[in-house]
């Protein structure tokens, strides 16, 4: 089971995101729990990004919102980098 690590930037973005989207509170908690249990679960829609963000991966909160992350597979760690809407993050 990978260890979930949040960056300071991610925490700041999350503190802005959560109050704006209270309807996603349960979905967010479920997504993070699933990410920790099985990062490759199909419902997360995990995929590697391209272009300037090619070192990162993305998972879906829903069809509009994403969480950017970085895998350190060797150490079994997942770093949460950013959270926001699909268009604003890419």
Annotate each predicted stretch with a short phrase.
Residues 30, 51-54, 69-73:
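Short alpha-helical linear motifs
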Residues 3, 12-17, 22, 61-90:
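Enriched for short, Lys/Arg-rich terminal
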Residues 32-35, 66:
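Hydrophobic alpha-helical segments with strong N-terminal bias
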Residues 22-25, 54:
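Short functional linear motifs
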Residues 6-7:
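PIN/NYN-family metal-dependent endoribonuclease catalytic core
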Residues 34-59:
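A short, surface-exposed loop/turn module that caps and links secondary-structure elements
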